[in-house]
């Protein structure tokens, strides 16, 4: 019996020693860095999926790149991606969920200006940083101090295509077409209109449509009768392509030039428009052929993952992640929503793949970078002649 008690005590001492040793090993091992939780709400279905899907793909490439690096000091991005369905009500529901349930440090998105205008006041009320991925309306970032934008404001870049049309193409008269129920498209039209008027270009027609419209024959008939040198379209990619096809079918003068906004830079524009969109001129946030190590790395990674060349939306999604990571880095250790917001405000002359390669926020937290004038040639997007 005594021998048995001694054996049990010896076993207990051995077990205690093993437990202590294991505890020492665990204490010596560095703790895993906590993930930084970010919400992302994008239009993966519905009206704005044409830009929401590629921006999500660009987002994924950016997340993989950041998480493979030591940019955040061992921390990783945990991005919760949800579909808004191109619906404002769903977009509002998601930002509330990201804030309250998921305790996200910030939110990326949404895809459209109509969704962005809807959720921007909510972001300010909740005091959670919001960085739009592809929504362009100035009303979004001007809604309050918690909202930032990745794409440049219409007033900054849209004027460039109008100036190009007047100075390089000799356009003296223009017809304007835009989506009246989309704040971003209204802003794009207004920016182009202001530039055209400043150059004494004659505005021969101003026609608005709904973003859901697919039959433009009545509008086209009016435009043909007005005999413009060019038609400026502030519409989504599919609508723009459909409009141009119908205009060609209706017999618009082949000499009429079609001018547009960054939406033209979607693969859907060429896929749907085909030969009808040859020669279209637009201002772009991005050109995949731009030189530079980061862009080449992005294009290579995107092509490897999706077997195609990234478009405007993909580049904006990727850039949004890189800007978000820079804000987190600038927020310091143990970031909070307040310090992340401060991190956004610290961003100056940030290298990006957009425009001419340098990004800043203006005083209203809108994006600033130079656009690139592009055209469609032989079924591909290429820089327009200088």
Residue spans of the language-model regions?
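Periplasmic-binding protein-like
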Residues: 98, 102-111, 131-133, 175-178, ...
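An alpha-beta-alpha
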Residues: 44, 147-211, 230, 324
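Segments of small-molecule ligand-sensing domains
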Residues: 304-314, 325-383
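Extracellular/periplasmic bilobed ligand-binding domains
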Residues: 123, 188-283
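Extracytoplasmic "Venus flytrap"
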Residues: 36-58, 62, 82-89, 111-114, ...
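Hydrophobic alpha-helical segments within soluble ligand-binding/sensing domains
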Residues: 91, 150-173, 186-188, 214-217, ...
């Amino acid at each position: 019996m005594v021998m048995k008690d001694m054996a049990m005590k010896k076993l207990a001492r051995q077990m205690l020693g093993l437990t202590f040793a294991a505890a020492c090993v665990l204490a010596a091992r560095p703790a895993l860095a906590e993930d930084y939780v970010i919400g992302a709400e994008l239009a993966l279905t519905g009206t704005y999926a044409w830009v929401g899907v590629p921006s999500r793909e660009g987002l994924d490439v950016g997340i993989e790149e950041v998480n493979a690096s030591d940019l955040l000091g061992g921390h990783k991005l945990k991005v919760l991606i949800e579909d808004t369905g191109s619906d404002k009500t769903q977009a509002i529901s998601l930002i509330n969920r990201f804030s309250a349930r998921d305790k996200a440090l910030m939110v990326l998105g949404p895809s459209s200006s109509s969704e962005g205008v809807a959720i921007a006041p909510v972001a300010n009320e909740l005091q959670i940083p919001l960085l739009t991925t592809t929504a362009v309306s100035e009303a979004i970032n001007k809604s309050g101090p918690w909202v930032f934008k990745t794409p440049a404001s219409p007033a900054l870049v849209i004027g460039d295509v109008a100036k190009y049309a007047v100075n390089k193409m000799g356009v003296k008269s223009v017809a304007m077409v835009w989506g009246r129920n989309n704040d971003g498209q209204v802003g794009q039209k207004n920016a182009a209109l202001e530039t055209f008027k400043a150059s004494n270009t004659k505005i021969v027609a101003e026609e608005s449509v709904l973003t859901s419209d697919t039959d433009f024959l009545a509008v086209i008939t009016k435009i043909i009768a007005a005999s413009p040198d060019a038609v400026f379209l502030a519409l989504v990619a599919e609508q723009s392509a459909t409009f141009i096809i119908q205009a060609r079918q209706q017999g618009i003068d082949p000499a009429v030039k079609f001018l547009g906004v960054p939406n033209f830079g979607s693969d859907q524009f060429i896929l749907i428009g085909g030969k009808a969109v040859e020669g279209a001129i637009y201002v772009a946030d991005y050109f995949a052929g731009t030189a530079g190590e980061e862009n080449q790395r992005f294009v290579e990674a995107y092509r490897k993952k999706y077997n195609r060349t990234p478009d405007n939306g993909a580049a904006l999604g990727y850039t949004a992640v890189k800007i978000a990571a820079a804000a987190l880095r600038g927020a310091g250790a143990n970031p909070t929503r307040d310090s992340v917001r401060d991190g956004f405000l610290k961003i100056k002359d940030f290298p990006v793949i957009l425009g001419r390669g340098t990004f800043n926020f203006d005083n209203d937290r809108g994006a600033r970078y130079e656009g690139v004038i592009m055209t469609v040639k032989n079924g591909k997007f290429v820089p327009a002649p200088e």
